[in-house]
C-alpha cells in the first residue's frame, strides 16, 4: 500500500499534461505515487503517458468519459493508498508542497481532508477562484472562500495564511483519507461535475470529521478546465447540483425554508441574467436545472435519509447563517474578512 497517491483525472488534456505533469513529478515523486486516470481521451494523452512517462506514472484507463465525480470513483477503486490526493491536470505545484499537507494529516487524525492554498497561474499574487484559501457556504448554499466571494478575487497578502477549518476543500487539489472517502460514499457520480467536492466535504462534516485548509502548502491553478465560465452547461450543472446537495445535506428543520428561498433566488438570478446581461443561454440553463432537480429529487430520498442518520452535529460553524447575497450586494462586503 502507498502512503500517498496523487491521482490526476484527464480527459483530452494532453496540453495540460505536457505543461504541468513534469512539475508534479519533479516535486512529488519522493513522497507520492503518481497516477493519471484517463476518461477515454481521444487526443494524444495516452500516447504521451505510455511513451514519455511510462516509468514514472501509473496509468488507469477508463472505458468512457465518466465525468469528474464518477471518473474519480472508478479510478480510486484501483488505487491502494492511505491518502488520496485528487489533483487537476491544470495545477502547477511548488517545491515541498506535499510536506505541510502530509504532516498536518498525520498529526490530526480527526481531519478527513485538506487543501493547499490555491493561487492563480495568470495573476500569481491573486487567489484562484476554485478554492482560494478554503471554502464555506452561506445559509442558502452559496459557496465562497477565504479570498474569493462570487467574482471578487482578493490579492494574497498573507491575510489567510493560518490553518483554518472549512466546510469544503477544493476538488482541484484535495487530499483525503481513503477510509473517509469511502465511508462517506465517495463523490456523487450523478453530479458528473461541479459542486461534487462541496457535497462530499459537507457529508464528511455531518459525520463529525474535519476539513481544513493548510496554506503553508500552495499551488497555482489555471481554472476553467472542465467547462469555461461562459458555457451554459456549467450554469446548469452548478444550479442543479447545488440544489441536490442542499436537499441531501440540509438539517430537517431548515430544509423547507431554505429550498423555498432558493426557488425565489434562482428565478431572480435567471431574470437578472436575461434582463441585465442579455444572456439567454444561462437564463434557460437555470430553468432547465430547476426542472431537472424537480424530476430527480425523488432519486435522492434514500441518500438524504442515510446522510441524516450519520449526523453528529446540528450546526456546522463553517456553514454560515447569513445570506451571502445580502452581504455582498446590499452591504457591499466583498472580502472574506468583512463578513460577519
Q: What name fits each language-model region?
A:
Residues 14, 23, 38-47, 64:
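A conserved acidic beta->alpha catalytic loop
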Residues 92-142:
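Conserved donor NDP-sugar-binding/catalytic core segment of glycosyltransferases
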